[in-house]
């Protein structure tokens, strides 16, 4: 038997094993593909046709657990909706939305290259990288939006909320925003516990002024960076 029949490229083998992946290359290059338990990042590497090739099981993203908690707490239905995830980063919120049944998620982030490869390849995800919240319009999101999630650094929820009004937001839409007290209050470091209520009040006022109603909040089940206390704010549009 010839060598070419016994060996195939890693890329070809992964396509055979996982035809659901539209583009396996990002998974390979990020070290998510294992050959006999060892990460291989060269898509042209020759592997035995009967070799053990597997996708690495990825740890849940922190944002995933945060969003799951608030969706459950406030009874936010996601099945079949169109959502915009502002500050998508690695995609914790985006993943949670898809897992809950969202039909489409616009994953918006000012940076680039952070979103997990599996999410990039998902046909339900529209990736809008290098896109600041101030640039969001119906030209970028040409659909009516049912849910907006916000997880931003260096910008308060109060400042972010009015910038969302350039989108076509349904009257039945919901908003979920992660309140980071340090950024909400414009502080150089983590605020004292007695300032946390001020941060929540600031975010709530900004959201209400931007046209949302019935704001309610909960403490995030997971701390932020450096152990920072964070809160999840939920509000309705109509």
Which ranges hold each PLM region?
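Conserved alpha-helix/loop element of class I SAM-dependent methyltransferases that forms part
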Residues: 62-81
